[in-house]
Structure formats: structure tokens, C-alpha cells
Design a protein with these regions (language model features):
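Strand-loop microenvironment adjacent to phosphate/nucleotide-handling motifs in alpha/beta enzyme folds
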Residues: 1-125
């Protein structure tokens, strides 16, 4: 069952999750804490992902309060972001440099789309 065929979510593999944890630990050891770490996740359409699992998909309609798209980093957080490769740190202090910060919110509308090969790896390993 799927609530909305237009629903998009930010997602990454468990391997990417493990790598993010390791990078976070390494970065914290070298630079100290005081930040929230995130990752430039890719967007996946839930209908496309469901098709990898089954051909029998029933659309049941949105639930109250359910969003079609997902926000990871909001407009008010942009000025406090620091980009390190595929990682995004959100700190308390403002980032004065525009060279290594986000310029727009990071969400399932702005994120790169997951390819069919990536979805296959996500589902089937």
C-alpha cells in the first residue's frame, strides 16, 4: 500500500549511513563538537521505490498531515551550514563564507534524484 504516488523522501543506504557515522566521529575528534551533521542524501519517489519491491501497489490516499516532500535543512538554517564534501554541518554560528555553505534549503525537491541502479542497490543490496 502507498499513500501518494507523488511522495518523495530523502534516503541513503546503510553503507552510506555507516560511512557518515565514521566521518562524524573523525571530524569530531579533530575539530570538537558543537554541530549537527547531515549528509547530502538523494531523493527517491516512493512509487518508483515500491515498484522495485512489488507490482501489486495499491494507492490508498494521503493521511492527514502527511507531506509530499521532505525537508532536511530549512531556510533559517542555511546561513549556519558548512559543507564538507557530501557532509553538511549545521553550527550555532553563522557561516560568513558563501563558498562552502548551502544557498537553498535541502529537501526532496532540491536533492539529486536516486537512479534506478541506486534504488536497486538500496532494495536488494
Amino acid at each position: 500500500k502507498l499513500t501518494d504516488p507523488d511522495m518523495n523522501r530523502l534516503i541513503f543506504t546503510k553503507e552510506d549511513s555507516a560511512k557518515l557515522i565514521n566521518r562524524t566521529v573523525d571530524f569530531t575528534r579533530k575539530n570538537g563538537g558543537g554541530f549537527v551533521q547531515s549528509y547530502k542524501m538523494k531523493c527517491v519517489n516512493m512509487l518508483d521505490l515500491a515498484k522495485f519491491i512489488s507490482d501489486d501497489i495499491e494507492i490508498v490516499g494521503k493521511r492527514p498531515g502527511e507531506k509530499t516532500d521532505e525537508d532536511l535543512i530549512s531556510e533559517r538554517e542555511i546561513s549556519r551550514t558548512y559543507i564538507h564534501g557530501d557532509d553538511i554541518h549545521i553550527r550555532m554560528e553563522e557561516n560568513k563564507s558563501e563558498d562552502n555553505r548551502l544557498t537553498e534549503p535541502y529537501n526532496s525537491k532540491s536533492a539529486p534524484k536516486m537512479t534506478s541502479d541506486e534504488m536497486g542497490k538500496l532494495v536488494w543490496g
